[in-house]
Amino acid sequence: ISDNGCGKFNDLTASVLKSIWQKGATHVWFTGVIRHATKTDYSAHGIPVNHPAIVKGNAGSPYAITDYYDVDPDLAEDVDSRMAEFEALVARAHKARLGVIIDFVPNHVARQYVSLCKPKGVRDLGADDNQSQGFNPQNNFYYCPGCSFEPYLDLYAGTAEPYHEEPAKATGNDHFDHKPGQNDWYETVKLNYGVDYYAGGIGYFNPIPDTWFKMRDILLFWAS
């Protein structure tokens, strides 16, 4: 980010938003809002550092979410006030008579997903999973029991310690073994909504899988 810079929430001023509305737009679609994996170090602000081996590029993929309840610090002028800056942007957009759309990524998350900003009482994705089972309808992820994550790439990525994950989790593009290839979404983990892909896609929806409730709560958080 020090080399290339990044647009900020605050850059979309009232006058900019008004000009968008005057061109006939009814909504603005802000992409990359939810916090995702990056190689930029924000540990001074209490944000965990992501292992570089599982971040694509330096800025990371905006679809490798690390916290569904947070916004991306790259987009804030004051990192510690990042959510307030986003909320102020939404308010400016509404005042300019524009609806607001953001990306919701329901299929997968980053490999080091940990929510710092989740509301009280909310359990993290994967926190209660039975990792000894490749598939369990109440798990949030899919696992490769007994196998560590062994992608095609160097898991050190210039660091002293390699990235380690055991059991390995399935990728967001449905690679269900522990050795994703160059064309796989190796930096992501697929979410389990109760479909057993190991058995040909059989669905288990009664009782309702836990992931559905967690994702419902995330949607309600943003809709509010």
PLM regions and their residue ranges:
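Short, intrinsically disordered, charge-balanced linker/junction segments flanking boundaries
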Residues: L220-S224
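N-terminal structural segment of carbohydrate-active enzymes
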Residues: I1-G99, N107-V109, V114-C117, D129, ...
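Acidic, His- and aromatic-enriched active-site or binding-groove loops in soluble protein domains
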Residues: I54, C117-F176
